[in-house]
Each structure stands twice: as structure tokens, then as C-alpha cells.
A protein has these predicted regions:
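Short, conserved micro-motifs composed of acidic
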Residues: 20-308
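Bacterial Sec-dependent N-terminal signal peptides
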Residues: 1-23
Length: 308
């Protein structure tokens, strides 16, 4: 009996000890480790199609890439048909997989090649095996003569995005244009519970609008740069005060571009986290290993298992 009790005690402590361990975010996917500077992540509900952004080190050029799973095996990443020129970032795949929204500084008029401010665009397809259409500008009232970024579409068609001028409380804010069944309504600021006179940007809103995850920059309870925060919608339909997701997820560097996979309860996000170890290097190989590590200050995509 004593041995049995000791065994039960060991298992109990082991189970609960494991759940209390300081688990941390890990690289999102093996194939992403070969890219020096990546950001943004969206995955299909069927778990067989991933879109992400690849940038150059200066972050002034970017393409949206796709990787597909065939016969239970991930294929090589490919550049999407609508990328290759201008700066295309922040893909978001709708629940049915038939539309992909993104932000781009491409010109609206095909007669010019001059880049413009950032707008929300989308491509569409008839079914999951069809090719994407040419990019379509969402238009007003979503887009304006200023910048619009990071689209997120909920099940009812509401479009959440980041704006840096129109209807903001100061700097970047999260706005929503609601879908009334025929068209989008005028942009609405999510209010002081979500936004401030500072920077709030890049929001993921759950399909049923139960919670929102987004980046707040330089807040008093932050860890040093931009942190991921979460807010839940209360029974009155209002957003509660956001809470910092904490040190298990956030870092001292920029943490942004969240995407939550409700199927697997996995949070994907981009981070410029960097682990600096004060050490003396004895040869060049050691230094090369240090600066080429995953957590080296460049944008990288991470994942973290969490039930929200």
C-alpha cells in the first residue's frame, strides 16, 4: 500500500509539475527555419494549406508564400501568384478557404507602377482546388488615402484591420467595418478599452468574435516593446480590458502578427525575440552559430499551445 501511495503521489506531482513548467513558444514549422526574416501566418481549417510572408533583411520587399500538404506530406513552399512585385504582407485565409485577404502597397490603377499607401486586398477562388483570381481591392469604406493593414474576417463577414490615421485615437488603432449583408459599413474604432493614444495593431479576432488578440506597444505593464494582449467580449457585447499574455508568450522584443488556430488550440505569432548570452567566442564558428540561431532578432514565426 505504501508503494502504491508513493507511486500515486509521484504521478500526481509529475502530472501537475509538468503543467506548471515554464513552457515557451517554439518554432512554428520546420520549413520556416530556413528563412531569415519571415512574419504572418494563416492556416486553413483543413490543416493542409499555410500562407506566410517572407521579407528581405531591410523589410522593404516582401512576398506571400504558400505551402500545401499533399498525401499527408508538406510540399516545398511556393510564391503565390499575386506576389512578386511591391510589398505584399499579412495574409488571412477565410474559414471556407475561398478568399485570402492581405495588405499591399500595389497601385490600384494598372496603368501605373508607382507604389501607393497600403490597402486591404483579396483574391478568391471557386473551390479549394482552383487557382486564385487577380487581386481585388476591397475599396471604400475600408480603404482610404491612408494605410490599412492586417485584415481579419469573422464568420459573419466583419472585417477587422489596423489603421494609422482614419478614426484613430492617436496613432495606430484597431478598427472594424461590419458587413450588413450587402456591403461594409463605415469604420468603427473599437474604443478606449482596446485602443489608446499610442500604438495598437495587428489584431486576430476569433471567428465568432469572442476574443481579440493584438499588439500594444510600450504599455506600462509591457515587457519592453510590443506585446500581445487579449480581450474577451462580455455579455453586453463590449470588449473587456485587455490583459498582457505574459512572459510565457511575450519577450522584451517585438511580438506581433497573431493567428489562433481554433482547431488545434495553437497560437501562432511573429517575434523579433533575441537571446543574448554574454560569452567570449573562441572562434568564428561559434560566432556564426550564435548569430544564425532562430532567436537572433529577426522576425520569426512561433507557436504556443494554449486554450483561450
Amino acid at each position: 500500500m505504501k508503494v502504491l501511495l508513493q507511486l500515486i503521489s509521484f504521478l500526481f506531482l509529475g502530472i501537475f509539475g509538468f503543467s506548471q513548467e515554464n513552457t515557451k513558444p517554439i518554432p512554428a514549422c520546420e520549413f520556416l527555419t530556413k528563412y531569415q526574416n519571415v512574419r504572418d501566418f494563416t492556416i486553413s481549417t483543413t490543416q493542409d494549406e499555410i500562407y506566410f510572408s517572407i521579407q528581405n533583411p531591410a523589410e522593404d520587399r516582401a512576398v506571400i508564400a504558400v505551402i500545401k500538404k499533399q498525401k499527408n506530406k508538406w510540399q516545398e513552399p511556393q510564391m503565390t501568384s499575386f506576389s512578386g512585385n511591391y510589398r505584399n504582407i499579412e495574409p488571412f485565409l477565410t474559414q471556407d478557404g475561398l478568399r485570402l485577404y492581405f495588405a499591399s502597397n500595389r497601385p490600384i490603377d494598372e496603368t501605373t507602377t508607382k507604389a501607393k499607401d497600403y490597402d486591404i486586398w483579396y483574391v478568391e477562388r471557386k473551390d479549394l482546388k482552383s487557382k486564385w483570381s487577380k487581386p481585388i481591392n476591397v475599396g471604400a469604406p475600408v480603404n482610404s488615402t491612408n494605410n490599412e493593414f492586417y485584415p481579419c474576417i469573422t464568420t459573419n463577414g466583419n472585417l477587422y484591420f489596423t489603421a494609422d490615421a482614419i478614426k484613430t485615437l492617436g496613432k495606430d488603432d484597431i478598427l472594424v467595418c461590419k458587413w450588413d449583408g450587402k456591403q461594409y459599413t463605415e469604420p468603427e474604432n473599437l474604443g478606449m478599452n482596446i485602443n489608446s493614444t499610442g500604438y495598437e495593431f495587428n489584431a486576430f479576432v476569433s471567428p465568432n468574435e469572442e476574443f481579440i488578440i493584438y499588439t500594444c506597444y510600450g504599455r506600462p505593464d509591457g515587457l519592453g516593446s510590443g506585446d500581445l494582449y487579449i480581450s474577451y467580449k462580455n455579455n453586453k457585447g463590449n470588449w473587456d480590458e485587455p490583459k498582457n499574455l505574459g512572459e510565457k508568450i511575450n519577450s522584451k522584443q517585438m511580438d506581433y502578427c497573431p493567428f489562433y488556430d481554433t482547431t488545434t488550440q495553437t497560437l501562432y505569432f511573429t517575434s523579433k525575440r533575441m537571446i543574448v548570452i554574454e560569452k567570449t567566442f573562441t572562434n568564428l564558428k561559434e560566432f556564426e552559430t550564435e548569430i544564425s540561431s532562430y532567436e537572433n532578432g529577426f522576425s520569426r514565426i512561433y507557436k504556443y499551445q494554449i486554450k483561450l
